[in-house]
Design a protein with these regions (language model features):
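A compositional/biophysical signature of low hydrophobicity enriched in polar/charged and small residues
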Residues: 1-167
Length: 167
């Protein structure tokens, strides 16, 4: 199973240490510092809920004091461009949909937006998460948001942009 974990770091002075520690876990595919109500976002892969729970424990050991875990509904919309994991993201956009809606039908449209790297239907407080390529950062409105707005079923969004951390 895939999940996106939004986390709050205990002390601001340990943001980089926490990011480095979380990224070191073999079950964490990607992790970024973000702007907004959370400090860190991590895309994780687990074989079971107990394993997901142990990933959260490791995150806590590295300084993440609070988490919000959103599990991907792999039976619904779940698509990634080839090489997605190796590309830097400028933002993750969480989408709340109007009901009734069919996010599986969004796949073709979302993947026609060049800067969309992946889109996943979620269990949790948001319905869909979309990752946007780093290349869109300079003209985010025209390259992504303007196109997203054409989906009339989008009710609300929350955009979490990334810090660029040189390693």
């Amino acid at each position: 199973m895939k999940a996106f974990v939004l986390g709050t770091v205990g002390t601001r002075s340990s943001l980089l240490d926490t990011l480095s520690g979380v990224r070191g876990d073999k079950n964490v595919e990607e992790s970024y510092l973000i702007w907004g109500p959370y400090d860190i976002i991590s895309k994780v892969r687990a074989d079971s809920l107990p394993q997901l729970n142990s990933i959260l424990d490791v995150m806590r050991e590295h300084g993440v004091v609070d988490t919000n875990t959103l599990i991907v509904n792999e039976g619904g919309l779940s698509v990634e461009r080839e090489g997605c994991g190796g590309r830097r993201k400028s933002a993750y956009v969480f989408i709340k949909m109007r009901r009734p809606s069919a996010p599986k039908l969004w796949e073709k449209y979302l993947m026609s937006i060049e800067d969309v790297l992946e889109a996943h239907e979620l269990f949790g407080m948001w319905d869909v998460v979309v990752s946007v390529a780093e290349e869109a950062r300079e003209d985010f409105f025209n390259r992504f948001f303007k196109k997203l707005w054409l989906l009339t079923e989008v009710n609300m969004t929350s955009t979490h942009t990334m810090f660029t951390v040189k390693e």
